[in-house]
């Protein structure tokens, strides 16, 4: 039985709790949320994980695993301290590692605690193939992300374009994965994940598009190197509760927790 604490109880966190509520091998003990959302979170947690308590911090709890489903801010506040205490962690908000020094802080904290932090693949596949290809040498990795125009509401794209007036797919960003994750942190976790598995944040090319006709989040990865080459296109349906997030992100967390808890993993 795997005892899990989770940071976050938004669309991703609730989706994870819902899918694992009947799994006897995964038990949620603590769900960590900001103080101003505790009442709302208690309602969801009582229905989906009645054995768990809602708190603002992990305090002296020592779960088998701490999983982050809360956004970039949670890494500094919750994940780094947990790693330093020797608690293994999983991270959904991989885009946070584009912030200067964050990747180094996570690694240093894990080393001090003698533990490990796992970066989850989220909405993209073939991360294992890309990471394996890096061993032999990669020459080029290009990531293109296409989302419904409304998914870019509240981002810098809204200041540059009239998203509601778009009539065709429009490139809203073209540059490095580091800049994509910095400018579009809630939309560019995939770009950061692809880059960290492959050529790195500064050598991975990224193009982001707002498409008024799109009903899915489309992720396309091209990679070439000593291994040969591959192209991957994924069409992910967004979460109903959060159009900025692919439903596959929730499923990737559930799979990762199952791999830790179950007798056989793949």
UniProtKB/Swiss-Prot annotation:
SUPFAM superfamilies per UniProt: Glyceraldehyde-3-phosphate dehydrogenase-like, C-terminal domain, NAD(P)-binding Rossmann-fold domains
BP GO terms, sorted: NAD biosynthetic process
A GO term, aspect molecular function: aspartate dehydrogenase activity
EC number per UniProt: 1.4.1.21
Keywords on record: NAD, NADP, Oxidoreductase, Pyridine nucleotide biosynthesis
Pathway per the UniProt entry: Cofactor biosynthesis; NAD(+) biosynthesis; iminoaspartate from L-aspartate (dehydrogenase route): step 1/1
Xref: Gene3D superfamilies: Dihydrodipicolinate Reductase, domain 2 (3.30.360.10), NAD(P)-binding Rossmann-like Domain (3.40.50.720)
Listed InterPro entries: Asp/hSer_DH_NAD-bd, Asp_DH, Asp_DH_prok, L-Asp_DH, NAD(P)-bd_dom_sf
Signal sequence region: none
Note: The iminoaspartate product is unstable in aqueous solution and can decompose to oxaloacetate and ammonia.
Annotated protein name in UniProt: L-aspartate dehydrogenase
């Amino acid at each position: 039985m795997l005892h899990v604490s989770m940071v976050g109880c938004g669309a991703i966190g609730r989706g994870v709790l819902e899918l694992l509520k009947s799994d006897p091998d995964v038990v949620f003990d603590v769900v960590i949320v900001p103080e101003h959302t505790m009442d709302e979170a208690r309602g969801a947690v009582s229905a989906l994980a009645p054995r768990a308590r809602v708190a603002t911090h992990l305090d002296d709890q020592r779960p088998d695993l701490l999983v982050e489903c809360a956004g970039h801010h949670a890494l500094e506040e919750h994940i780094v301290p947990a790693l330093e205490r020797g608690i293994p962690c999983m991270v959904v908000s991989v885009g946070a590692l584009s912030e200067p020094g964050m990747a180094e802080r996570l690694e240093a904290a894990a080393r001090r605690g003698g533990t490990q932090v796992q970066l989850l693949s989220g909405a993209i596949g073939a991360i294992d193939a890309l990471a394996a290809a890096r061993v032999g040498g990669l020459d080029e990795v290009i990531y293109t992300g296409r989302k419904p125009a409304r998914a870019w509401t509240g981002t810098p794209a809204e200041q540059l374009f009239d998203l509601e007036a778009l009539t065709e797919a429009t490139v809203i960003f073209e540059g490095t994965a580091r800049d994509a994750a910095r400018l579009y942190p809630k939309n560019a976790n995939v770009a950061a994940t692809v880059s960290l598995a492959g050529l790195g944040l500064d050598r991975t090319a990224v193009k982001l598009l707002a498409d008024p006709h799109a009903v899915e989040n489309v992720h396309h990865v091209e990679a070439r190197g000593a291994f040969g080459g591959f192209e991957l296109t994924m069409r992910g349906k967004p979460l109903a509760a959060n159009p900025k997030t692919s439903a596959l992100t929730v499923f990737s967390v559930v799979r990762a927790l199952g791999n830790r808890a179950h007798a056989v993993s793949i």
